[in-house]
């Protein structure tokens, strides 16, 4: 049976307490573009970088105020090293808490959105052809 041809990750859907607050956060902090066709109604709100991103959905009626994040630990956006450094400066100016990590082949910066979802930006720091040679 042949492998499926996956083009890439399209979106990660998350539940948030306040759709507008979350949409504004993803735009202000990460520079994602809002995409919300009228035909969809009030949600979801897609926050996109190119053709991939986050789909924001409101919390369900009856959900606790502290939303459960299921088994998702975090989600990551791929950036170049210059953008990673720009993110550090931007997060500092915005007063956001963040964590920098060296993953040998990648460097990453982590922060949390208003609902506590961990958002990572990651940049490869070795030759991509070497790292992805067996993929």
For the regions a protein language model found, what residue spans apply to each?
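Short beta-strand micro-motifs in enzyme catalytic cores
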Residues: 43-45, 73, 107-109
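Conserved Rossmann-like nucleotide-cofactor binding loop
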Residues: 52, 82, 117
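Vicinal oxygen chelate
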Residues: 1-5, 88-89, 93-135
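Short glycine-enriched loop/turn motifs at secondary-structure junctions
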Residues: 6-8, 68-72, 102-103
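N-terminal beta-strand motif that seeds the catalytic metal site of vicinal oxygen chelate
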Residues: 1-20, 74-75, 79, 127-135
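Short, conserved charged micro-motifs
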Residues: 21-22, 82-87
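Core segments of cupin and vicinal oxygen chelate
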Residues: 14-54
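Helix-adjacent hinge/juxtasegments
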Residues: 57, 63-73, 78
């Amino acid at each position: 049976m042949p492998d499926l041809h996956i083009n890439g990750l399209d979106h990660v859907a998350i539940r948030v307490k306040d759709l507008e607050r979350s949409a504004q956060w993803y735009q202000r902090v990460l520079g994602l573009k809002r995409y919300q066709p009228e035909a969809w109604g009030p949600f979801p709100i897609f926050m996109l970088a190119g053709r991939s991103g986050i789909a924001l959905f409101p919390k369900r009626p009856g959900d606790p105020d502290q939303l459960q994040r299921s088994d998702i630990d975090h989600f990551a956006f791929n950036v170049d090293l210059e953008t990673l450094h720009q993110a550090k400066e931007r997060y500092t100016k915005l007063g956001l808490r963040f964590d920098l990590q060296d993953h040998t082949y990648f460097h990453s910066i982590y922060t949390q959105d208003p609902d506590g979802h961990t958002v990572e930006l990651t940049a490869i720091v070795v030759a991509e052809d070497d790292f992805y040679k067996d993929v």
